[in-house]
Amino acid sequence: MSDWDTNTIIGSRARAGGSGPRANVARSQGQINAARRQGLVVSVDKKYGSTNTRGDNEGQRLTKVDRETDIVKPKKLDPNVGRAISRARTDKKMSQKDLATKINEKPTVVNDYEAARAIPNQQVLSKLERALGVKLRGNNIGSPLGAPKKK
């Protein structure tokens, strides 16, 4: 037999005649375990790459803290931010509970942010900014939040 006699089929027709196991995507842990019990080849790969998600850099900071030898204090909220939150909330005649329900957080979270006890979370701060209409990050903390910039 020469090289010209053997057929190499690549692509979707490679399994002609139903020979060999088909590659499946297991959707649950039970399906993976069933395949392992049957002795099939199992490759568990996590799929990455969603379009509009950004990683939280808090994990990087925690890794840095783990590698440090001396004690590192956690980030705390600036007291000016807490005062700005409480001032804007009272100007809008809202209770802490009302503000918490408006931003879908617990009232204790709002209380911690107003008392400047909370570890700053960018998502919660942005929700508070939008609900109160006041800047809470960067320069000019407590100034009115401008309208979105026109493109």
UniProtKB/Swiss-Prot annotation:
One of the record's GO cellular component terms: nucleus
Signal peptide: none
Effect after changing residue 89 to K: Decreased ability to prevent stalled ribosomes from frameshifting
Swiss-Prot/TrEMBL keywords: Cytoplasm, DNA-binding, Nucleus, Phosphoprotein, Transcription, Transcription regulation
Region annotation (Disordered) ranges: 1-29, 78-98
Residues recorded with modification Phosphoserine: 143
GO biological process per UniProt: GCN2-mediated signaling; maintenance of translational fidelity; rescue of stalled ribosome
Xref: SUPFAM superfamilies: lambda repressor-like DNA-binding domains (SSF47413)
InterPro entries: Cro/C1-type_HTH, Lambda_DNA-bd_dom_sf, MBF1_N
A Gene Ontology molecular function term of the record: DNA binding
Subunit composition and interactions: Interacts with TBP and the transcription factor GCN4. Interacts with RPS3/us3.
UniProt protein name: Multiprotein-bridging factor 1
Origin species: Saccharomyces cerevisiae (strain ATCC 204508 / S288c)
Gene from which this protein is expressed: MBF1
